[in-house]
Amino acid sequence: MELIFLGTSAGVPTRTRNVTAILLNLQHPTQSGLWLFDCGEGTQHQLLHTTFNPGKLDKIFISHLHGDHLFGLPGLLCSRSMSGIIQPLTIYGPQGIREFVETALRISGSWIDYPLEIVEIGAGEILDDGLRKVTAYPLEHPLECYGYRIEEHDKPGALNAQALKAAGVPPGPLFQALKAGKTIMLEDGRQINGADYLAAPVPGKALAIFGDTGPCDAALDLAKGVDVMVHEATLDITMEAKANSRGHSSTRQAATLAREAGVGKLIITHVSSRYDDKGCQHLLRECRSIFPATELANDFTVFNV
């Protein structure tokens, strides 16, 4: 999987940062696709600065209904239709997301020429497509808000082709059945169990993408053991009380959570517009003093998961 940050500013855009939007490139050999997490104003314009085709976008996950995470959605939906894209799209979000989309389309006289499904979610598993699952966790914010945990299913281990050939199993369709863990019968009557020739399963990757939040009970479960955690660091340590009073987190709180959850990497985003480039580097240093494996997301930064 690959993360592409389309917007990394909190609340309002700056000259160098648009408001929140994160693209997830699934990069799976049998199921390509793009998922979008939040869609602040201007997201479709940010997409134009990438090589990604909006037609590949098949799922959008909205964390909450504050404008800096949502106001780009109607425009993106309409432009997708005007471009002749007919591939289905599913939107997941909290209660009210359906009314928002339908009202925006109705009042503006807009229409959508592709299948559009809107799923209003609660806490718990919201999706399992056979390759990965997505679970929503409630966060601490003035509006109903969720973070999303994306977990790939484990992949089958490598097939020991050399041992199978030595056992007299010819390559081809039988190898495919054994790779799936099935038992086959050879012409001489011998049974070969695929599980006996498979290496241990390869653990799937796990990713946690937080919406806006102050410290909360669900955060540790959401982030526990993931390879990459994306979390806001709206304000620095000296402004922690102000951040919490508005349902946000400081650098210290983001980094401390990453350390306690045992994540592989922390990526901080959603930084206040009060910080220029020098100020953003200060935020990064504060996080790294607690959790060294921290990176700062800028607009169009790409990270592998």
From Swiss-Prot:
Class in the EC hierarchy, top level: hydrolase
InterPro entries with a match to the protein in the record: Metallo-B-lactamas (IPR001279), RibonucZ/Hydroxyglut_hydro (IPR036866), Rnase_BN (IPR013469), RNase_Z/BN (IPR013471)
Binding-site list for Zn(2+) 1: 64, 66, 141, 212
Residues annotated as binding Zn(2+) 2: 68-69, 212, 270
Pfam family, one: Lactamase_B_2
Cofactor(s) the protein requires to work: Zn(2+)
EC number(s) reported in the record: 3.1.-.-
Gene3D superfamilies in the cross-refs: Ribonuclease Z/Hydroxyacylglutathione hydrolase-like (3.60.15.10)
Residues annotated as catalytic: 68
Keywords: Endonuclease, Exonuclease, Hydrolase, Metal-binding, Nuclease, tRNA processing, Zinc
Cofactor note as given: Binds 2 Zn(2+) ions.
Subunit structure: Homodimer.
Known function: Zinc phosphodiesterase, which has both exoribonuclease and endoribonuclease activities.
Protein name: Ribonuclease BN
Organism, as annotated: Escherichia coli O17:K52:H18 (strain UMN026 / ExPEC)
